[in-house]
Structure formats: structure tokens, C-alpha cells
Regions:
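Active-site beta->alpha loop and helix N-cap motifs at the rims of alpha/beta catalytic domains
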Residues: 2-118, 122-134
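Short, conserved loop/helix-junction motifs that constitute active-site signature segments
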Residues: 54-56, 117, 352, 444-453
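Phosphate/diphosphate ligand-binding glycine-rich loop within oxidoreductases
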Residues: 234-348
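Catalytic alpha/beta core domains of metabolic enzymes, predominantly
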Residues: 102-233
Length: 505
């Protein structure tokens, strides 16, 4: 069940927002604390503005007037707030009313609860924290459930992967109806996974005022993450990194899971502790993971087995689980290689073998590129502005250059320019130079392309960098970084689908 949080300043604007999204939502939460004016009669009638709803039935509405101290927008007299809640609920149009945990302890909400009982409105008993999880969430759920018929609600902002794990465990171990959701980047997965965690409902929003709290719009929830199809048997896949919310991977993998008929979902998880993530992966029974910066190296000690691509490159970008545990590979290697090999087979009779290539850059991204090239018998020259780094990476990868040569030089110097000219069948750019927002930069502005070079830039934002544009203008065939992303993601998708079949069997 998916509820949209409404935070517009007028009742009519909120009704319009709700009606625009009736295709994707099951109900709404009216955040009356965001209203510029709160006339009691109009507030009480608000649910009637949404009739009829989906399937010609009424739209369930939660009435919430959140105090400033709980992360809301209401700063007025507490007695006035409670009277507003009492009178609006007493009209009998709201399906739920949200009341904070402290009100039941003091008994100050007795009149609101009495009005709710008479009108058939269910009470949601809530706890909110923007400063971590606020202690033992399991115990708090028990306290929030103390009054019969009330639905406990926990909305917190986890500040770490460990706190997300605490939230997930609390929801999975709870019994009965509950709403346990996280806010912010660390809490985002709990929004999507609410049905998997056994929650009664989750929240979404299109209003920027609720960006931190609700996190994602209704259409994305339903069309990308297929929220309404998720259940406690759904397989959970993830991409981990820090930061992670910019990742393109959910938009790539989720449609492919749907096309394959998989009861699976792929979510971004912000990870500050790899150890905590693997505890979370065990709790959620995660069969496959995409790994991005800064965790490609730090995940390796947690894996049962790694293949040569991980050993050579020193980084793992894909994890899958089998009967014996998690295994790691690096699909960046073949993801980079596939579009290049396709072009090479059409240009040269022997394909890549025996060609001469220059790799610009000696950072982490270059290692997968260098390893892929020398594995295919390409003679490689590594150029970097810090010469010692170019030398180090070539020495580390030289044991894998079984049928190829591997040399190095200083980028921008005469010697380096000479090496570049002698290794110009293929030129691969692996640095961040030219990446958004630095789009006017070029890693080798002094080099004059001749038109015979096959030029590859692994940067995919922008799709065509200044480096690639200059090469294309000189008649060179170019390969965009987006092709590498697509290639490695496709390989990941195959591995994830295999892991899903193994899990299902």
C-alpha cells in the first residue's frame, strides 16, 4: 500500500496533486501543518475532494499535523492543534489520524482518540527522529502498539548503514501491523522495500518540501521499482556506494528484472561500512550486488572467492551469492572490452591482438582497461601526469602481460608524446578530465589526431567529451563511455538472473 504525502499550502492544491497520481497511489497523507490556513470545516471535508478514487472507491486519507519539534511545520498552540485534529476527525471523513507517542503517555490526546473511535478513524501512533534511530526500535514498536487498535509508526533518519540495519531488523521481527520507514539517503531502501519488510504501507511525495522525508515520487515507485508487486518473497538486489543516489543502475536493472518475469527489485543502498552492509545483506538475503566507489576494494576481504579480473584489477564491482557464499568479479573488464573488440574485428584482420594502444591515466579506472587490453594481446603504453603512478600500475599488471608489452611514460612531455605516437592504434582516456562539470577540458590538448586512431573515453557524462569530439572531427572512430556502462551492466544482469534462478531452485 502506497500513500502520497501532500505538503502543498492549500487544500485545493493538495487535492490536485493527489488526483494527478491516483493511478500510482492507494491513499494520501494530508500534512495539514504545511497549510497556509487551516479552516476546520474545510479541513474536515478534504477527503471528499478526492472522491471517487481508484476503482470508484474513496481515497483513504491520513490526517497529520506535525509539530516543528517532530520535523513538521506546526508552531502554534498545542491545545489548538489537538482541537483541530479532534474536530476534523470527528466529521468522519478521514480513514486515519496520526498522533505522536508522547500524547498517549500524557493523555492529552484523549478527546482526539474518542472522536476517532466514534467516527471509525484509526489512530496511527508515531515516533519521529531526525537524529538517528533514537534507541531500540523493537522496544519502541512495542510501546507504540500499547493501545488496542493503533498502528505503530516509526519514521527516522538513519545516519549510517548500521542504523539502516537496525531499522530493517525491527520491522522484520515485529508482529502485526506497523509502519517502519527511514528518511534521507540511508533510509531510502526502506521506502521501496516496505512490503518486503512486512510494513502496512509506505510513503512517497512529489513536493520538494518532503524530499528528505518521503524521498521518491509515486510514478517512480510504481514504474521503476514496481512497488505494488513487491512482497515478502521478493529477491532484493542492490548497488552500494557512498554517495549512491545518483546511480543509473536501478534504471538499468529493474526494467530487465521485470522483462525476465523476476519477483525481484534492485535498490540503491548508501554504505559507510562494508561490514555493516554484509550484515544487512544477510538479513535481507541479498543474492547480488553492484559495487561502486568507494567500496570496490574494501568488499574483497568479505568474499568467499574472487576471479582473476578482481585479483589483477584490485577491485570488485559485482558480487553474486551461491551455495558457498559471495563471489566477486569485475564486469568493468569485459564491459570495457566488448564495444572495443567489436570495432577492432571490423578494422583489423587479427582483431585486437598485436595492436598498440595508449591508456591515459593511471588511477583505479585505468586498471580494468589495461588488464583487458593486455589480456587480449594489445601492446600498451600507460601515460600519466604523475609518472610514478604510471610506472607503479604497469609494474603491478606486468605479470598479466603474457602476450603483450607494457610500458609507461609521463603525459604531456616529449617522451610521452613520442610513446603516444607509437601506440596510437587505440587511445583510451580513463581520467575524470572532461567529465561534467569540467566539460571544456581535454587530457591531451597538444595531440593532433590523424584519423586512423580508434578513440575511447570511459567518461559517460557528457556522452561526447571534448576529447572525443576533437577526435571525431579529425575522422577518428570513437567509442563513448556509455557503451562501457551498458556492457558491464548487461554482464551484471546476466549474473544476477543466474543467481535468481539458483535462489528460486
Amino acid at each position: 500500500v502506497l500513500f502520497q504525502s501532500l505538503t502543498a499550502s492549500t487544500l485545493s492544491a493538495n487535492a490536485l496533486l493527489a488526483r494527478e497520481n491516483l493511478l500510482w497511489i492507494d491513499g494520501v497523507e494530508l500534512r495539514a501543518d504545511f497549510l497556509s490556513a487551516v479552516p476546520t470545516d474545510a479541513l474536515a471535508r478534504f477527503p471528499q475532494l478526492l472522491q471517487p478514487g481508484k476503482n470508484d472507491r474513496g481515497v483513504p486519507v491520513i490526517l497529520t499535523i506535525r509539530r516543528r519539534r517532530d520535523g513538521g511545520n506546526f508552531e502554534g498552540d498545542e491545545g489548538k492543534r489537538l482541537r483541530l485534529l479532534r474536530d476534523a476527525v470527528g466529521a468522519g471523513n478521514f480513514s486515519f489520524v496520526d498522533l505522536e507517542e508522547d500524547l498517549s503517555a500524557s493523555g492529552s490526546d484523549e478527546e482526539v482518540r474518542r472522536a476517532a473511535y466514534k467516527s471509525g478513524t484509526r489512530v496511527i501512533r508515531s515516533f519521529h527522529s531526525f537524529d538517528g534511530t533514537g534507541g531500540d526500535l523493537g522496544e519502541r514498536l512495542v510501546r507504540l502498539s500499547a493501545l488496542p487498535g493503533e498502528i505503530p509508526r516509526i519514521s527516522v533518519v538513519p545516519h549510517s548503514t548500521r542504523e539502516l540495519l537496525q531499522l530493517v531488523r525491527a520491522s522484520l521481527r515485529a508482529r502485526g501491523q506497523r509502519i517502519v520507514v527511514g528518511m534521507g539517503d540511508y533510509g531510502f531502501p526502506s521506502r521501496i522495500l516496505s512490503p518486503v519488510l512486512g510494513n502496512t504501507l509506505s510513503f512517497c511525495s512529489q513536493n520538494s518540501a518532503e524530499r528528505v522525508e518521503a524521498g521518491v515520487d509515486p510514478r517512480t515507485m510504481q514504474e521503476l521499482y514496481r512497488y505494488s508487486t513487491l512482497n515478502q518473497s521478493t529477491a532484493i538486489y542492490a548497488v552500494i556506494g557512498n554517495p549512491i543516489m545518483h546511480s543509473r543502475s536501478p534504471a538499468y536493472h529493474n526494467p530487465r528484472f521485470a522483462a525476465a518475469g523476476m519477483n525481484a527489485v534492485y535498490v540503491p543502498i548508501r554504505v559507510d561500512s562494508v561490514s555493516s552492509f554484509f550484515d544487512l545483506a544477510g538479513e535481507l538475503d541479498i543474492p547480488g550486488v553492484s559495487v561502486t566507489i568507494p567500496h570496490k576494494e574494501s568488499v574483497i576481504p568479505f568474499l568467499k572467492e574472487i576471479d582473476e579480473s578482481v585479483t589483477a584489477v584490485g577491485a570488485c564491482n559485482t558480487i553474486v551469492r551461491d551455495e558457498e557464499g559471495y563471489r566477486g568479479t569485475n564486469t568493468d573488464v569485459d564491459g570495457f572490452l566488448t564495444p572495443l573488440a567489436n570495432r577492432a574485428s571490423k578494422r583489423w584482420a587479427g582483431g585486437l591482438a598485436g595492436r598498440a594502444a595508449t591508456v591515459i591515466g593511471a588511477g583505479g579506472a585505468s586498471r580494468a582497461v589495461i588488464y583487458a587490453l593486455i589480456r587480449e594481446g594489445v601492446n600498451v603504453c600507460v601515460l600519466n601526469r604523475t609518472e610514478s603512478r604510471a610506472r607503479a600500475v604497469t609494474e603491478e599488471l606486468s605479470p598479466y602481460a603474457r602476450n603483450a608489452s607494457l610500458t609507461w611514460g609521463k603525459l604531456g612531455q616529449p617522451e610521452g608524446n613520442c610513446l603516444l605516437s607509437g601506440h596510437s592504434d587505440i587511445i583510451v582516456q580513463t581520467t575524470s578530465v572532461g567529465m561534467f562539470p569540467d566539460t571544456d577540458s581535454d587530457p591531451i590538448p597538444e595531440y593532433r589526431f590523424h584519423g586512423h586512431e580508434l578513440v575511447y573515453d570511459i567518461v559517460y557524462n557528457p556522452p561526447v567529451t571534448r576529447f572525443l569530439s576533437r577526435a571525431a572531427d579529425c575522422g577518428c572512430e570513437v567509442i563513448q563511455g556509455g557503451e562501457m556502462f551498458e556492457g558491464q551492466a548487461l554482464l551484471q544482469s546476466h549474473l544476477f538472473q543466474n543467481a535468481y534462478r539458483l535462489r528460486s531452485s
